[in-house]
From Swiss-Prot:
One Gene Ontology term, aspect cellular component: cytosolic large ribosomal subunit
Sorted UniProt keywords: Methylation, Ribonucleoprotein, Ribosomal protein, RNA-binding, rRNA-binding
Keyword Glycoprotein assigned: no
GO terms, molecular function: large ribosomal subunit rRNA binding; structural constituent of ribosome
InterPro entries noted in UniProt: Ribosomal_uL11, Ribosomal_uL11_bac-typ, Ribosomal_uL11_C, Ribosomal_uL11_C_sf, Ribosomal_uL11_CS, Ribosomal_uL11_N, Ribosomal_uL11_N_sf
GO biological process: translation
Name listed for the protein in its UniProt record: Large ribosomal subunit protein uL11
Similarity comment: family membership: Belongs to the universal ribosomal protein uL11 family.
Quaternary structure, from the entry: Part of the ribosomal stalk of the 50S ribosomal subunit. Interacts with L10 and the large rRNA to form the base of the stalk. L10 forms an elongated spine to which L12 dimers bind in a sequential fashion forming a multimeric L10(L12)X complex.
PANTHER family in UniProt: 60S RIBOSOMAL PROTEIN L12, LARGE RIBOSOMAL SUBUNIT PROTEIN UL11M
Gene that produces this protein: rplK
Statement: the UniProt record of this protein carries the keyword Ribosomal protein: yes
UniProt organism field: Corynebacterium kroppenstedtii (strain DSM 44385 / JCM 11950 / CIP 105744 / CCUG 35717)
Known function: Forms part of the ribosomal stalk which helps the ribosome interact with GTP-bound translation factors.
Native organism taxonomy: Bacteria, Bacillati, Actinomycetota, Actinomycetes, Mycobacteriales
Post-translational note: One or more lysine residues are methylated.
Length: 146
């Protein structure tokens, strides 16, 4: 087995799928660690081509020889909820001012999408996490069982 490479840095970014470019915030974050920015942009854009329109978080592990690996995450729950409710942004006062609504089935659908990143044992628990995120954004959850 080849010897393990030594990790020199860890970067977390949220970039539009298929639209990574060397401009901020990508360029400065990667440049500080000595990563080949264009190489990352091409690899990221190729990997996220099928998810265009979503923000896809990425965790980049940078090694001492300036090589890197990256792991794609699922889009943030807040962005998926805004898309499901057809909103631009959440409420500034979520407890008093409701800006939209989603159904329990939509919460389950989002939980299904995010299941690998959620800290939940089953789909219902995942949907409850998503419903909590919705409530904190001022989005009403209709037909909730919790």
């Amino acid at each position: 087995m080849a010897p393990k490479k030594k990790v020199s840095g860890f970067i977390k970014l949220q970039i539009q799928a298929g639209q990574a470019n060397p401009a901020p915030p990508v360029g400065p974050a990667l440049g500080a660690h000595g990563v080949n920015i264009m190489e990352f942009c091409k690899a990221y854009n190729a990997a996220t081509e099928d998810q265009r329109g979503n923000v896809v978080p990425v965790e980049i592990t940078v090694y001492e020889d300036r090589s890197f690996t990256f792991k794609l995450k699922t889009p943030p729950a807040a962005k998926l909820l805004l898309k499901a409710a057809n909103l631009q942004k959440g409420s500034g006062e979520p407890n008093t001012n409701k800006v939209g609504s989603v159904t329990w089935d939509q919460c389950k659908e989002i939980a299904q999408t995010k299941m690998e990143d959620l800290n939940a044992n089953d789909l219902d628990m995942g949907a409850r996490i998503i419903a909590g995120t919705a409530r904190s954004m001022g989005i009403e959850v209709k037909g909730a069982t919790a």
